[in-house]
């Protein structure tokens, strides 16, 4: 094992028994051979479970939608990338030459994906309890700063944060119709989300309100909220 990887293990607070798992977690798909995408898939599932379980215990009075919004904030790519940069994770990534030249070691999505892959690797190397311990340790300051006030965001913001946490494209809004007299108009808006087969719709006395209604409908269609939060 190289000195650099020993340093990374100290930063992560975990020493791998299987060094190949660690190396695989640090290997981007642009690098020749096997890559970290399967570990990322596993780590994402573990991260969401651990964060959800911790929020369930921390906020016993929170509604489902509130818990979902808090979790989306915890596991979004931006949060994970900040953690990854704190570990200097970009210095250890194995990238293809093209990705390396384009600055992939600084890219938010690549850093976040690699951190999720490391979570998956720790789980395979040492089991759920150790993976849970590491995740909660890394996210401790984020957990401490959370309050239910963080859930009081408008639907467009909540939808954007949810999609960002899944590394999905941002929603697209389009005014499809305007009805009524100039002093009393009704705007009809469609919201397109790549995860949904159908566009969500909203209407209101302004474009902004119609977009918020459409975003709220998209959150319900995605199963993030149930319409009663």
From Swiss-Prot:
Catalytic residues, per the record, are: 44, 116
> Which superkingdom is the protein from?
Bacteria
Domain spans labelled RNase III:
5-127
- What is one term from the GO cellular component aspect held by the record? cytoplasm
- InterPro entries in UniProt: dsRBD_dom, RNase_III, RNase_III_dom, RNase_III_sf
Write down the top EC class of this protein: hydrolase
Q: Which terms in the Gene Ontology molecular function aspect does this entry carry?
A: double-stranded RNA binding; metal ion binding; ribonuclease III activity; rRNA binding
Cofactor(s) essential for the protein = Mg(2+)
List keywords of the entry alphabetically: Cytoplasm, Endonuclease, Hydrolase, Magnesium, Metal-binding, mRNA processing, Nuclease, RNA-binding, rRNA processing, rRNA-binding, tRNA processing
* Subcellular location(s) per record: Cytoplasm
SMART domains assigned: DSRM, RIBOc
The protein's Enzyme Commission number: 3.1.26.3
Q: Where is the DRBM domain?
A: 154-224
- Residues reported in the UniProt entry to bind Mg(2+): 40, 113, 116
Q: Which reaction does it catalyse?
A: Endonucleolytic cleavage to 5'-phosphomonoester
Could you state one GO biological process linked to this protein? Answer: rRNA processing
User: Matching HAMAP family, A to Z?
Assistant: RNase_III
Provide the family line.
Belongs to the ribonuclease III family.
Assembly behavior = Homodimer.
What protein name applies here? Ribonuclease 3
Source species of the chain = Pseudomonas fluorescens (strain ATCC BAA-477 / NRRL B-23932 / Pf-5)
